[in-house]
Amino acid sequence: MKPSVILYTSNTGFTAQYAALLSEQTGLPCFSLKAAGHIQPGTPILYLGWLMAGNVQVYKEAAKKYTVCAVCGVGMGATGSQIADVRKTNALPGEMPVFVLQGGFDRKRLHGIYKLMMTVMKNTVGKSLARKPDRTPDEDTMLDLLENGGSRVSPENLSSVLDWYFGLSVSE
């Protein structure tokens, strides 16, 4: 089934940026889940949510109201990584397309428990990665994000999502 709208939940803005880029590329309207009250229940959607420990935030709420055609999780990990983990953690059906997009990290945009959790992550994972002598390029990127923050949002990261979307026929 082809989605007719993009809905998303964003915490620090990186997921919203990807949703806007997808909207530009596909021509689909795009709304935050909070602003989607006018979207009819059962509408086929492409859902984007930020990732926390493999969990696509607010996915279950979206899935209760809408027909989710595909899920994009946006996190700090490399684009295309963690797909099996995201599928398992969120109990996504095997036939549902799942995408993971690298977003970014901005400590200033975090609040409350999330700020505390990411401070702990920086102090544990960041220090562990910094000491690791044979880091992979993905680990170098993760370390850079943890230490310096920044955005890795890029239209190029959407290639798999766009290939999936434009490969669908209207009847699918």
Regions found by a protein language model. Name each.
Residues 24, 61, 84-88, 115, ...:
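Charged/polar, solvent-exposed surface patches and flexible loops
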